[in-house]
């Protein structure tokens, strides 16, 4: 049976991000940022288009990100991911995820499984939070929200007829006003749950090869292999 990587994301992220993260990549559902008209954007102070384009360029070259995942009723979890175009590697306590552009590989230590699958775009979106930053903005109604000093917050609400974020009512991205870098991603689910990713560091990821997005046999040799391709 194909695992459900969307909907009630929080239930699966609890112990070890079982729900298999957002981002993340995600990912990389977007190759270009076609920005829809923004409601209430302070263009003279902050340019959302430039902020998104800057992040996209970082991802194209390879970027490493450390973050903290928090959700209701669970302890905060530290995570690490690096993104390279559509490909990504994600590390959380008890779980490792890799996507090489075609095959999604998941090591789940709590269930002692190594899963391989050909993911849908929704599967990828459910895996990596930072993917939401890269979503094609034409699919969303974007509004600026009230924000703490030194930051800018935008809410992204899927337009009618789109189903990119299955189970997600809307999400918000907080940017640093000076550096224009994303600082936080908050996902608000239809059932009332909220999952937040606080980004601590974004830096270039060097020495990326094709082997960066897969696992060596010794990493999963003691696990049950579940091949869903």
Q: Can you annotate each of these PLM segments?
A:
Residues 1-18:
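N-terminal secretory signal peptides that target proteins for export/translocation
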Residues 23-34:
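Bacterial N-terminal signal peptides
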Residues 32, 36-75, 86, 218-229:
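N-terminal leader/targeting segments and the immediate start of mature chains
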Residues 41-42, 148, 159-170, 177-229:
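Non-transmembrane domains of secretory- and envelope-associated proteins
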Residues 60-66, 84-90, 149-157, 179-186:
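Short, hydrophobic/aromatic-rich segments at coil-to-beta transitions
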Residues 69-71, 92-93, 108-109, 186-189:
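Beta-turn initiation residues at beta-strand->coil junctions
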Residues 78-127, 195:
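An acidic-aromatic
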Residues 119-150:
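Flexible, surface-exposed loop/linker segments and immediately adjacent secondary-structure boundaries
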């Amino acid at each position: 049976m194909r695992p459900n990587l969307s909907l009630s994301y929080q239930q699966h992220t609890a112990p070890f991000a079982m729900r298999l993260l957002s981002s993340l990549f995600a990912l990389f559902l977007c190759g270009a940022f076609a920005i829809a008209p923004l409601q209430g954007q302070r263009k003279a102070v902050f340019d959302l288009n430039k902020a998104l384009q800057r992040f996209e360029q970082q991802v194209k070259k390879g970027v490493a990100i450390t973050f903290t995942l928090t959700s209701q009723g669970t302890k905060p979890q530290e995570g690490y991911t690096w993104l390279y175009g559509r490909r990504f590697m994600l590390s959380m306590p008890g779980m490792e995820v890799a996507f090489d552009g075609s095959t999604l590989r998941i090591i789940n230590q709590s269930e002692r499984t190594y899963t391989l699958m050909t993911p849908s775009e929704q599967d990828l979106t459910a895996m990596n939070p930072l993917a939401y930053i890269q979503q094609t903005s034409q699919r969303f109604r974007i509004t600026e929200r009230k924000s703490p000093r030194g930051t800018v917050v935008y809410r992204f609400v899927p337009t009618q007829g789109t189903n990119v974020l299955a189970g997600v009512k809307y999400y918000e991205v907080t940017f640093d006003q000076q550096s224009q870098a994303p600082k936080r991603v908050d996902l608000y689910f239809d059932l009332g749950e909220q999952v937040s990713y606080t980004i601590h560091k974004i830096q270039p990821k060097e020495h990326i090869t094709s082997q960066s997005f897969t696992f060596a046999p010794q990493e999963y040799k003691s696990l049950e292999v579940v091949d869903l391709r």
